[in-house]
Amino acid sequence: QILDDHAERYRELKPWQYCGSVYKIAASGKQTGRAAGTWNTMEINCTGYHYQVRHNGILIVNATLDEFPELMERRLEGFLGFQNHSEEVWFHDVRVGLPLAP
C-alpha cells in the first residue's frame, strides 16, 4: 500500500491501510513516510509467504504465515502491477529481482 499517511483525509484509516502495509493483512508498524512531494524509498521482499517491507530504510512489516495465515490467500506467482485510485504518484528506479542485502 502506498499512501500519504500525513494527509488529513486519511487520519482515520484501518491500521492495514497505511503506507507500507500488506493490504487487509499486515499493518505497517510505523508511519515513516516523508511529506508529499518528496521522494520516499520502499523495498518489498517476498520470499514464499514471508513479507518484509522497508520504508525509507526502516523495517515496518515482517509478516510470516505463522502470524498472518491470510497470506496463504496471496499467489506466489503472477504479475506485478501498480494501481492508482486518483492521486498523482511518481515512481523511479523500480527494480524487480533477488532481495537486496540488509
Where are these regions (language model features)?
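Carbohydrate-interacting regions of secretory-pathway proteins
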Residues: 1-102
